[in-house]
């Protein structure tokens, strides 16, 4: 339990550090390198378009990250007549998390990167957080590849160029042909790629569970759920204003029906 509580502190700090490093690289390396193009128009310069897109992806990722933490999915009134820490909740979808020390309604899982449980109130924000984090990381990787290609005069036309970049760069770094800042960007390329793929896979997995009207906790416990149309399951999580939620981080408006069903 001590290791889990320690991980609950280290994982959010790791995420915030990666976010800070990404912002620094974007502002002080990638954007200045795009401004050096004299043929680009001022109104639609690559630096302006890149900065606007990156800020949009980052604002949605960090905004939904904050909302996942603020929208605590606990429902301490779900267990009536006994202490939530000693008596299991009557509803099969409620769960007491020992790491959070709280009862979660429609518990899905505990996310260590947010330090919070994922349930009915913050499920939509969590899915959007995974989506925009994946897009921001993959887009940062593309921008980093363009920067490395221009600085080191490396062509990525060959399909295996990205796979052989790291071992080649390590040997060149120790020989003095690659600077420390350039080597750091190359390492970040692989880190962005790994985080982007992981978040994309997790987002797709959560969407499949939402379409089936299930949570990961119910799947692990083998709890049977009532079959419903997939459109209704999506609306229960994302609400009627789902398009607005895709563009602007906002509170979950689709969890009221799920709350009433589990009480």
Curated annotation (Swiss-Prot):
UniProt tissue specificity: Widely expressed.
Keyword vocabulary terms for this entry: Acyltransferase, Endoplasmic reticulum, Golgi apparatus, Lipoprotein, Membrane, Palmitate, Transferase, Transmembrane, Transmembrane helix
Superkingdom classification of source: Eukaryota
Topological category with respect to the lipid bilayer: Multi-pass membrane protein
Cell compartment(s), UniProt: Endoplasmic reticulum membrane; Golgi apparatus membrane
Cytoplasmic side: 1-9, 70-125, 168-182
EC number, as in UniProt: 2.3.1.225
Annotated catalytic residues: 111 (s-palmitoyl cysteine intermediate)
Signal sequence interval, chain numbering: none
Gene Ontology biological-process annotations: protein localization to plasma membrane; protein palmitoylation; protein targeting to membrane
Function: Palmitoyltransferase that could catalyze the addition of palmitate onto various protein substrates and be involved in a variety of cellular processes. Catalyzes the palmitoylation of KCNMA1, regulating localization of KCNMA1 to the plasma membrane. Might also mediate palmitoylation of CNN3.
Family statement drawn from the similarity comment of this UniProt entry: Belongs to the DHHC palmitoyltransferase family.
Oligomer and partners: Interacts with CNN3.
Name of the featured protein: Palmitoyltransferase ZDHHC22
Organism of this sequence: Homo sapiens
Organism lineage: Eukaryota, Metazoa, Chordata, Craniata, Vertebrata
Gene that this sequence comes from: ZDHHC22
